[in-house]
Protein backbone atom coordinates (compact mmCIF):
# COMPACT_ATOMS: atom_id res chain seq x y z
CA UNK A 1 0.00 0.00 0.00
CA UNK A 2 1.39 3.41 -0.91
CA UNK A 3 0.57 6.73 0.65
CA UNK A 4 -1.66 7.41 -2.35
CA UNK A 5 -4.10 4.75 -1.13
CA UNK A 6 -4.27 6.29 2.34
CA UNK A 7 -6.98 8.89 2.28
CA UNK A 8 -10.36 9.25 3.91
CA UNK A 9 -12.62 6.46 2.75
CA UNK A 10 -9.72 4.44 1.27
CA UNK A 11 -7.30 3.18 3.89
CA UNK A 12 -8.48 5.74 6.45
CA UNK A 13 -11.81 6.25 8.16
CA UNK A 14 -13.63 9.47 7.39
CA UNK A 15 -12.53 12.07 9.95
CA UNK A 16 -9.91 9.75 11.53
CA UNK A 17 -8.88 9.60 15.18
CA UNK A 18 -11.56 11.79 16.68
CA UNK A 19 -11.16 9.85 19.92
CA UNK A 20 -7.67 11.32 20.18
CA UNK A 21 -8.72 14.97 20.27
CA UNK A 22 -9.48 15.33 23.98
CA UNK A 23 -6.64 12.96 24.92
CA UNK A 24 -4.13 15.17 23.09
CA UNK A 25 -5.67 18.34 24.51
CA UNK A 26 -5.74 16.99 28.07
CA UNK A 27 -2.09 15.95 27.85
CA UNK A 28 -0.89 19.29 26.54
CA UNK A 29 -3.13 21.97 28.02
CA UNK A 30 -2.96 21.32 31.75
CA UNK A 31 -6.62 20.72 32.55
CA UNK A 32 -8.26 17.80 34.31
CA UNK A 33 -9.98 15.55 31.77
CA UNK A 34 -13.62 14.56 32.11
CA UNK A 35 -12.72 10.86 31.73
CA UNK A 36 -9.77 9.03 33.29
CA UNK A 37 -6.69 9.63 31.15
CA UNK A 38 -6.20 5.87 30.71
CA UNK A 39 -9.67 5.59 29.17
CA UNK A 40 -9.00 8.42 26.73
CA UNK A 41 -5.57 7.07 25.79
CA UNK A 42 -6.99 3.57 25.26
CA UNK A 43 -9.74 4.91 23.00
CA UNK A 44 -7.23 6.93 20.99
CA UNK A 45 -4.83 3.98 20.65
CA UNK A 46 -7.65 1.63 19.61
CA UNK A 47 -8.66 4.06 16.86
CA UNK A 48 -5.05 4.35 15.70
CA UNK A 49 -4.59 0.55 15.84
CA UNK A 50 -7.68 0.10 13.63
CA UNK A 51 -5.83 1.90 10.81
CA UNK A 52 -3.42 -0.31 8.85
CA UNK A 53 0.25 0.22 9.65
CA UNK A 54 0.80 1.52 6.10
CA UNK A 55 -1.71 4.32 6.68
CA UNK A 56 -1.17 5.23 10.35
CA UNK A 57 1.18 8.14 9.71
CA UNK A 58 -1.12 9.57 7.07
CA UNK A 59 -4.05 9.11 9.47
CA UNK A 60 -2.15 11.05 12.13
CA UNK A 61 -1.28 13.77 9.61
CA UNK A 62 -4.94 14.15 8.55
CA UNK A 63 -6.07 14.18 12.20
CA UNK A 64 -3.46 16.77 13.25
CA UNK A 65 -4.15 19.10 10.33
CA UNK A 66 -7.90 18.95 10.88
CA UNK A 67 -8.05 18.99 14.70
CA UNK A 68 -5.19 21.43 15.28
CA UNK A 69 -4.68 23.52 12.12
CA UNK A 70 -1.62 25.78 12.17
CA UNK A 71 -3.80 28.83 11.51
CA UNK A 72 -5.61 28.21 14.81
CA UNK A 73 -2.73 29.84 16.68
CA UNK A 74 -3.47 33.03 14.76
CA UNK A 75 -7.12 32.93 15.74
CA UNK A 76 -8.45 30.88 12.80
CA UNK A 77 -9.53 27.25 12.71
CA UNK A 78 -12.23 25.47 14.67
CA UNK A 79 -12.98 26.52 18.23
CA UNK A 80 -10.98 24.86 20.98
CA UNK A 81 -12.59 23.06 23.89
CA UNK A 82 -13.75 25.65 26.44
CA UNK A 83 -11.42 24.24 29.09
CA UNK A 84 -8.33 25.07 27.02
CA UNK A 85 -8.89 28.47 25.40
CA UNK A 86 -5.23 29.53 25.45
CA UNK A 87 -3.45 26.26 24.73
CA UNK A 88 -0.89 26.71 21.93
CA UNK A 89 -1.74 24.80 18.78
CA UNK A 90 1.88 23.82 18.10
CA UNK A 91 2.12 22.09 21.49
CA UNK A 92 -0.91 19.93 20.62
CA UNK A 93 0.41 19.24 17.11
CA UNK A 94 3.81 18.19 18.51
CA UNK A 95 2.23 15.84 21.05
CA UNK A 96 -0.14 14.31 18.48
CA UNK A 97 2.87 13.47 16.29
CA UNK A 98 4.08 11.15 19.09
CA UNK A 99 0.97 8.95 19.27
CA UNK A 100 2.56 5.99 17.44
CA UNK A 101 5.67 6.04 19.68
CA UNK A 102 6.39 3.46 22.42
CA UNK A 103 5.49 5.91 25.21
CA UNK A 104 2.03 6.30 23.73
CA UNK A 105 0.31 3.70 21.51
CA UNK A 106 3.49 1.82 20.43
CA UNK A 107 2.18 0.88 16.99
CA UNK A 108 4.20 -0.01 13.88
CA UNK A 109 3.89 2.26 10.86
CA UNK A 110 4.89 2.23 7.20
CA UNK A 111 8.42 3.10 8.39
CA UNK A 112 8.79 -0.32 10.07
CA UNK A 113 8.70 0.87 13.67
CA UNK A 114 6.49 2.82 16.07
CA UNK A 115 7.21 6.26 14.62
CA UNK A 116 6.20 8.62 11.83
CA UNK A 117 8.26 11.06 9.80
CA UNK A 118 6.47 14.38 9.43
CA UNK A 119 7.55 17.23 7.15
Swiss-Prot record:
Q: Where in the cell is it found?
A: Secreted
PROSITE patterns (alphabetical) = CEREAL_TRYP_AMYL_INH
Temperature and activity: Optimum temperature is 25 degrees Celsius.
The organism sits in which domain of life? Eukaryota
Q: Which cysteines bridge via disulfide bonds?
A: 6-55, 20-44, 29-87, 45-105, 57-116
Q: How does activity depend on pH?
A: Optimum pH range is 7.0-9.0.
Keyword Disulfide bond in the entry? The reply is yes
Q: Which residues form the signal peptide?
A: none
Q: Which InterPro entries match?
A: Allergen/soft/tryp_amyl_inhib, Allergen/tryp_amyl_inhib_CS, Bifun_inhib/LTP/seed_sf, Bifunc_inhib/LTP/seed_store
Look up keyword Ligase and say if it applies: no
Annotated function: Inhibits bovine, insect and wheat chymotrypsins. Inhibits bovine chymotrypsin with Ki of 0.6 nM. Does not inhibit human or wheat alpha-amylases, bovine pancreatic trypsin, or trypsin-like activity isolated from wheat.
- Family per UniProt? Belongs to the protease inhibitor I6 (cereal trypsin/alpha-amylase inhibitor) family.
Protein's name in the database: Chymotrypsin inhibitor WCI
